[in-house]
Amino acid sequence: MVSLKLQKRLASSVLKCGKRKVWLDPNEGSDISMANSRQNIRKLVKDGFIIRKPTKIHSRSRARQLNIAKRKGRHSGYGKRKGTREARLPTKVLWMRRMRVLRRLLKKYRETKKIDRHMYHDMYMKVKGNVFKNKRVLMESIHKSKAEKAREKTLSDQFEAKRAKNKASRERKHARREERLAKGPGGDIPAAAPPAQTAEVPAKKSKK
């Protein structure tokens, strides 16, 4: 049998595919073996002696079904696992994910003025120190801290108001004292009222 390696190589170049995709008609081997140029190969392709094989379809439907099941937690038991827990999902990757989530939340709260820069820095350092397990715990801590700060501010305002009131009272007392001292030792003693004249009551006549 005549070797058709040259014709197969030229046909793959003309058809722009691999040599495995080229089909040569076994009944026309003598005519195909005479073709030694790309022009002759094109003529044979036109005549149907050389054909490009169709692409084989490799269905992914089963793979898609398996992926959907794995997202639900199926096929993930101990028997399906290859590698240690650290190899499958490193703790460093988990740490990075958690840090990014918590820091993103802190940045969002700072930009929307929900927290000031001092609280942002305090919470940022606590996040770095592994104080918060997840986003919910961080949000609860922020709300608790804000409530505590508001309570302290209310108490401080009440204390300041009380101090101001006491100070004003002391100033009034001091002013009254200075006023009394300025008037002199007996200046503020009221003059004695004249004695009231007693009306003479007529004596009752005794009955005889």
Curated annotation (Swiss-Prot):
Family matches, as PANTHER family: 60S RIBOSOMAL PROTEIN L19
Molecular function as annotated in GO: mRNA binding; structural constituent of ribosome
Protein name (database record): Large ribosomal subunit protein eL19y
Keywords from the named record: Ribonucleoprotein, Ribosomal protein
Compositional bias ranges of the Basic and acidic residues kind: 144-163
InterPro entries named in the record: 60S_ribosomal_eL19_sf (IPR035970), Ribosomal_eL19 (IPR039547), Ribosomal_eL19_CS (IPR023638), Ribosomal_eL19_dom (IPR000196), Ribosomal_eL19_dom1 (IPR015972), Ribosomal_eL19_euk (IPR033935)
A biological process term (GO) from this entry: translation
NCBIfam families xrefs: PRK08570.1 (NF006343)
Gene transcribed to yield this protein: RPL19C
Gene3D superfamilies named among the record's database cross-references: 1.10.1200.240, 1.10.1650.10
Organism: Arabidopsis thaliana (Mouse-ear cress)
Region of interest (Disordered), ranges: 144-208
Annotated Gene Ontology cellular component terms: cytosol; cytosolic large ribosomal subunit; cytosolic ribosome
Compositional bias of kind Basic residues: 164-175
Domain of life, source organism: Eukaryota
Similarity remark: Belongs to the eukaryotic ribosomal protein eL19 family.
Signal peptide: none
